[in-house]
Amino acid sequence: MKIALAQIDTVLGNKRKNLLKIENLCSKAAKENVDIICFPELSTTGYSPELLGSNLWNLSESFGGKTDTLLSELSNSLKLTIICGFIERGKISGEVFNSAGIWIPHKKHFLGTFQKIHLINNERIWFTQGMHIPLFDTPKCRVGIMICHDVGFPELARIIALKGADIIFLPSAWHKEAKDIWTINCASRALENGIHLAAVNRCGKEENLHFFGGSQLIDARGQTLKLANYNSEELIFCEVDFNEQLKTRLEIPYLRHRRTDIYSIEYTDKNEY
């Protein structure tokens, strides 16, 4: 399976310009016969909720919105699965989620969304935390999604793996001050679950926030297969070998050697793993 990691900078609050960039990169990816392309956290609007402020609601979208319509059309015309971060409008007035949507060919709207579960810093003031851990069946594989700070919580990645994901995508807006933590977390989640992890970090600045890039595909042994540059935009293409992933799970049996007779992870839908 061939994937593309779209490491981009965004214009804060300018959805039109950001969507135009996303559209252009989707077209480039399709020309390279990519199966899945992933964009960073909040790619359509920029990241900083405190800078967007009360405009968050106006920038938010739900089923059938501008982002959903455009990416559905692109997915269908390009035969491309698209994962993209955006501000999702909730059912209650003023409720917004830091979400990543997924679009697959032959559907008129997004397949679904993952709403960021672990909010950090000022995100907690503006966004509502997610409550669900969905998986998404695409034409090529079963996809799990986490967003940025979610990668620091082993339980989430473990549940995604145990539910049957083939790969985890991690749209992010990670700051350069914590670059070392990013590297360790991404490799650890991949290795301990025997799963490929595609981490897509944005670049650029928003006032005092500096996003460092460094998007990467990590294999099931926790090794980096492809690494984007630091600090500038880049579209990188990667091959994912699920046969190698299966081989790794046989050689490094962390999932099979869990002692569920003495411990478990309980997900609030009452399924235990």
Question: Across the structure, where does each feature detected by a protein language model lie?
Answer:
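Cys-nucleophile CN-hydrolase/nitrilase-fold catalytic domain and related Cys-dependent amidase chemistry
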Residues: K15, E23-P105, H175-I195
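Short polar catalytic/cofactor-binding loops
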Residues: Q7-G13
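C-terminal beta-strand edge segments of enzyme domains
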Residues: L135, R202-Y273
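Short, acidic/polar
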Residues: K17-C26, F153-R158
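Extreme N-terminal starter segment of soluble prokaryotic enzymes
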Residues: M1-L5
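Active-site catalytic loop in hydrolytic enzyme cores
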Residues: G90-K163, K176-I184, S188, K247, ...
